[in-house]
Amino acid sequence: MKTVIFAGGLGTRLSEETELKPKPMVEIGGKPILWHIMKLYSYYGFNDFVICCGYKSYVIKDFFYHYYMHSADITIDLKKNDIEYHSATSEPWKVTLADTGLNTQTGGRLKRIQKYIGNEPFMLTYGDGVSNVDIPALLEYHYRHGKLATMTAVLPSGKFGALEISGDNKIDSFCEKPQGDGNWVNGGCMVLQPEVFDYIPDSDYDSCIFERAPLENLAKDGQLQAYKHTGFWKPMDTLRDKTELNEMWNNGSAPWKVWK
């Protein structure tokens, strides 16, 4: 089964980082967040990826084209124009890098890579957040309910600490990062049947936002199910998010690192 990853956005709230690279290439622990996302799927045996590139797509293509070199010590013989690799580590991944346009919306990006999916079910997620979603459990749930689409639903944490204050203004408890307002939100990690492509227009699809009409119509037709994930999930939307994720990684307490 293929895993599609949206990786074409501009990442305007991370402008200090994304002037030179696309948002999915912003690093956590010295590796792009895209790599961390792929490692989760790979841990569960899913190694066939389709990356929907857009903004500065050449950065993503260069990373994977030279992946073997990035992960090894090398000896370069300039006279012979020869490179010797030492103790290189690689991944069992097959990666299709598709340029889906600079300003294309998510529905258009998905429609543009339909030719790489064929008539098979596939998974879809975003290239700017990490989680510890149990992928086999997600798939089992998807096939059990039999609908066309499953979306992982998450409860995002609040941005600020929460205080419980008694009548005399005494603080009875303090919670550093409680859950947000109690509303479930789209956490990515979707499983989709190929019929989902029928919900995206066949023409003028570049302006189609997948999270609008396609998903809304799937919901109206009773074909969209939620897989509730109460474990770790965190998007990297701001420099603060990037700092927090790097601190988790550097402290050896990254909940999304399920691999060894």
Locations of regions flagged by a protein language model:
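Short coil/turn segments at beta-strand junctions that form active-site/ligand-binding loops
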Residues: M1, N47, N119-P121, G222-Q223
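N-terminal glycine-rich phosphate-binding loop and ensuing alpha1 helix
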Residues: M1-D62, H66, L97
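Structural beta-sheet core signal
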Residues: T3-I5, I51, L124, A149-T152, ...
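Well-ordered alpha-helical segments embedded in enzymatic catalytic cores
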Residues: H36, G108-R112, P214
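Conserved beta-loop-beta/alpha segment of the NTase-like Rossmann-fold superfamily
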Residues: V59-G167
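Catalytic-core segments of class I nucleotidyltransferases/pyrophosphorylases
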Residues: P121-M123, V130, I135-Y143, L155-G158, ...
